[in-house]
């Protein structure tokens, strides 16, 4: 009798993607983040669904509906904090996943990489809109500041901003629209993730050595399913500790003040996972220039495959590139710190230097380092 797992049209797809998938035998824990991102996405969709059952997207009741969820709904507080901190875990996994791709040269799978960039933009848009929904001070002013950036677009900017606002300021129409998009986009992300996997399985996974290991592959199950379960348990452990012991650690206290259009908070800043991009935005005095730098800080990933000058794929055997990579990581951490600081003397200069260094490493230093490494090896 033939195995249903290998013959049934639906089971066959699952089997070829998660069970009998030939996988390199040497992939490290850095390859765990794909499955962790899947878990985060499912968790966010489920907790979000239960929150949406009690949330009202109206400016007069949005803030109190979130309070109602935390106080009156059975286990509403844990659902709310799982959703809020789940977003933080999502972005930690995302940045690790992208960092892994940069380090090991996974960007040479251009289709997979480009879908990944689209996914990153979509998730960032979803998270931004989700932050607006509790309708606290930082929600309102964050929405005002970020949507207002579109007014820097020549000719159509002002009309575009008013179209997104649904009026002449951030108000009821904006909140309702953001809720609608925040609800639908995770399902778009789910579909894009399936396409991301589809393209990945066309080529097979990369591995730390960067060499195509067709002669040495093992089935995904049980070897990597058990490894992914360990990663998932660690993720759940960290998330649980965060939710149960310090749920507001990564949030902003200002968001516990209901939105007031007449009172601006002293420091308007986004959630921690956007601070690096926010620092790049603020480091350019010109509005349009800042917006372009903000978009390019992520879009620059799309040209990384074109700037790959090394004869080797990953950085495993390239010490100069490794140093530059970790300098880039340190630079991004510096930008994250700067993004959360007020616009004052030392911070402005540090932010500008860190922004220049960010683009310099990716556009100039890494390609040059690769050429130097090729010459050292006489390739």
Swiss-Prot record:
GO cellular component: mitochondrial inner membrane; respiratory chain complex III
GO terms, biological process: mitochondrial electron transport, ubiquinol to cytochrome c
Cross-referenced SUPFAM superfamilies: a domain/subunit of cytochrome bc1 complex (Ubiquinol-cytochrome c reductase), Transmembrane di-heme cytochromes
Main location: mitochondrion
Keywords, ordered alphabetically: Electron transport, Heme, Iron, Membrane, Metal-binding, Mitochondrion, Mitochondrion inner membrane, Respiratory chain, Transmembrane, Transmembrane helix, Transport, Ubiquinone
Binding positions for heme b b566 per the UniProt entry: 97, 196
GO molecular function: metal ion binding; ubiquinol-cytochrome-c reductase activity
InterPro entries to which the protein is assigned, alphabetical: Cyt_b/b6_C (IPR005798), Cyt_b/b6_C_sf (IPR036150), Cyt_b/b6_N (IPR005797), Cytb/b6-like_sf (IPR027387), Cytochrome_b (IPR030689), Cytochrome_b_C_euk/bac (IPR048260), Cytochrome_b_N_euk/bac (IPR048259), Di-haem_cyt_TM (IPR016174)
CDD domains: cytochrome_b_C, Cytochrome_b_N
Source organism superkingdom: Eukaryota
Cofactor note: Binds 2 heme b groups non-covalently.
Entry membrane topology: Multi-pass membrane protein
Misc: Heme 1 (or BL or b562) is low-potential and absorbs at about 562 nm, and heme 2 (or BH or b566) is high-potential and absorbs at about 566 nm.
UniProt-recorded name of the protein: Cytochrome b
Organism of this sequence: Halichoerus grypus (Gray seal)
């Amino acid at each position: 009798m033939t195995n249903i797992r290998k013959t049934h049209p639906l089971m066959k797809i699952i089997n070829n993607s998660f069970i009998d998938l030939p996988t390199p035998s040497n992939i490290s824990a850095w390859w765990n983040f794909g499955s962790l991102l899947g878990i985060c996405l499912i968790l966010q969709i489920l907790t979000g669904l239960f929150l949406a059952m009690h949330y009202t997207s109206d400016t007069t009741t949005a803030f109190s509906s979130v309070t109602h969820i935390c106080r009156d709904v059975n286990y509403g507080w844990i659902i709310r904090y799982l959703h809020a901190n789940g977003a933080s875990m999502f972005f930690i996994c995302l940045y690790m996943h992208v960092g892994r791709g940069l380090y090991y040269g996974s960007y040479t799978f251009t289709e997979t990489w480009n879908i990944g960039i689209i996914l990153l933009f979509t998730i960032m848009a979803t998270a931004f809109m989700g932050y607006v929904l509790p309708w606290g001070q930082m929600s309102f002013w964050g929405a005002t500041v970020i949507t207002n950036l579109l007014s820097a677009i020549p000719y159509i900017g002002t009309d575009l901003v008013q179209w997104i606002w649904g009026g002449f300021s951030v108000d009821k129409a904006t909140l309702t629209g953001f809720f609608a998009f925040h609800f639908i986009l995770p399902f778009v992300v789910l579909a894009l993730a399936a396409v991301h996997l589809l393209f990945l399985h066309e080529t097979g996974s990369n591995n730390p050595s960067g060499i195509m290991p067709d002669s040495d592959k093992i089935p995904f199950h049980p070897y990597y399913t058990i490894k992914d379960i360990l990663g998932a348990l660690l993720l759940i452990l960290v998330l649980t500790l965060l939710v149960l012991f310090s749920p507001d650690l990564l949030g902003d206290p200002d968001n516990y003040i209901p939105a007031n259009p007449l009172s601006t908070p002293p420091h308007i800043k986004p959630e921690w996972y956007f601070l690096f991009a926010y620092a790049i935005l603020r480091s350019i005095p010109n509005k349009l220039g800042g917006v372009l730098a903000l978009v390019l800080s992520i879009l620059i990933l799309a040209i990384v495959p074109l700037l790959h000058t090394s004869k080797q794929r990953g950085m495993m055997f390239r010490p100069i590139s490794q140093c530059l990579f970790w300098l880039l990581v340190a630079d991004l951490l510096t930008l994250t710190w700067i993004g959360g600081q007020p616009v004052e003397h030392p911070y402005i200069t540090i932010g500008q230097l860190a922004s220049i260094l960010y683009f310099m490493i990716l556009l100039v230093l890494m390609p040059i380092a690769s050429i130097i490494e090729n010459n050292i090896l006489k390739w």
